Amino acid sequence: ENFMQGIYDKINYIAYSATTQEELCYGEKGVYEEGYFSRERELKRQMVRLFNSFYVDDLQIYAKNGKDYYFSVKQEVKKPEKEEIAKMIQQATDAMGGIVCINDLKHSGHLQIVKEVRDNLKMSPIGTIRLSINSDALEQIRKNVNFASEGAVLILDEKNQIVQGQASELS
């Protein structure tokens, strides 16, 4: 629980930061700002600082203005298809700014976390953040839980399907 809360806090930090807000509101598609102190470069540095973890495989921010910001910890990360991304963005939109966890372990091997970013002043949607956590990280979290007696940890998705752990541990 602490791990996921930490991830949620980082996502919220990026979503509400002044740099993200300005870039998602005023950035222009097809325009790359080269200056070290440009909003785009500052946003990318912020993404690297907050998510350089072996738990996180990639982080992507989709702006309503058409710009796309991507950061990956690994070289060979399988990015979701456009249809999957559209579905995730719709789920984030339906949550109206809330954080949504999507079980995508069977397809991509990741737990996808999405959040709709809203303008701090107008509360209108300006983009979506997508973060993927690899299944190895979930297994490591599950194994690190220690009980004083017999016990096991299962990680379930929103439909109570087992994400990590064995069904035999339920008995």
Which residues does each predicted region cover?
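Extracytoplasmic/periplasmic ligand-binding sensor regions of membrane-associated signaling proteins
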Residues: 52-132
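A short, polar/proline- and glycine-enriched secondary-structure boundary/capping micro-motif
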Residues: 80-84, 142, 171
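Juxtamembrane extracytoplasmic/periplasmic/luminal helical "stalk" adjacent to the first N-terminal
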Residues: 1-28
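Amphipathic coiled-coil signal-relay and dimerization helices
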Residues: 22-24, 62, 67-74, 160-167
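Short glycine-enriched, charge-decorated loop/helix-capping segments at active-site entrances
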Residues: 28-33, 75-78
